[in-house]
């Protein structure tokens, strides 16, 4: 068997995993529930639209799975608010991480910034990019 064929066979084997398939199925159903609930329940829309942030992996998943046919009434509002929330949070963590970097610049020697968001900006950025919060 050629190396290319062996690689293809290994890729097919590693494509499926019972646990990964179950997790993926559950997550895709949850995403569908978000769309359906946003479309049908005003309280959920208000709660969703007032969130301070969504992690990048879930933003990506919600945008990639979005289908206008499933969200006829509120689809535009949904994507607009999802983008607004994520963009606002991205701007905030960009500002925080910039301030954090300035703290370690030699020109800022002796200056202190007691802002908790600035001091936690690295952890907050990792959580945003990966969807995982660093261990306490």
Please identify what each model-predicted range represents.
Residues 1-136:
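Intrinsically disordered, low-complexity regulatory regions of eukaryotic proteins
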């Amino acid at each position: 068997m050629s190396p290319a064929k062996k690689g293809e066979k290994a890729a097919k084997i590693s494509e499926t995993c019972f646990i990964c398939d179950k997790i993926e199925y559950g997550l895709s159903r949850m995403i569908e529930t978000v769309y359906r609930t946003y479309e049908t329940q005003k309280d959920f829309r208000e709660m969703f639209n007032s969130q301070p942030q969504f992690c990048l992996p879930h933003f990506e998943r919600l945008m990639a799975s979005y289908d206008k046919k499933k969200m006829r009434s509120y689809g535009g509002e949904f994507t607009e608010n999802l983008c607004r929330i994520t963009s606002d949070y991205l701007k905030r963590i960009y500002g925080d991480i910039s301030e954090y970097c300035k703290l370690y610049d030699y020109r800022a020697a002796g200056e202190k910034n007691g802002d908790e968001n600035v001091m936690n900006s690295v952890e907050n950025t990792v959580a945003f990019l990966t969807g995982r919060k660093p261990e306490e």
